Amino acid sequence: HADETIEVSAIRELEEETGWTAEHAEVLLIGPTSSGSSNEKIAFVRATGLRKVGEGGGDGDEDITVHEVPRAQAAAWLTAKMSEGYELDAKLWAGLWMIEHHLDGRPRG
């Protein structure tokens, strides 16, 4: 998959891992996962035009449980999971904010 754009890769991974595909993917931000400690980078991508096409769950050696949570309930669902003792990646919160806001803080319309 070395020739793929970030957008194409994001849509492919979305489908493999969740069973959903997207008509469009927009790169919102690319940055380091751990500044100064690694050269690894993460891309935050906003997918739109979603539709269910399969079961998801990953491929081969991946063991992914898919949770389908409506966007409007995502923050409450994540908060409930934390109160149940789950440790969640902080990037989830950044991603939720970025899909609803431009980087300068303006709401997406």
Stretches found by the model and what they are:
Residues I6-V8, V27-I30, V45, V53, ...:
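Extended aliphatic helical segments
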Residues I11, A25-E26, A75, G95:
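Generic N-terminal initiation segments characterized by hydrophobic and/or small/turn-forming residues
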Residues A2, S35-S38, A43, G60-G109:
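Nudix hydrolase/Nudix homology domain
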Residues H1-R12, E16, L50, G58-G60, ...:
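Conserved Nudix-box catalytic region and its N-terminal flanking loop in Nudix hydrolases
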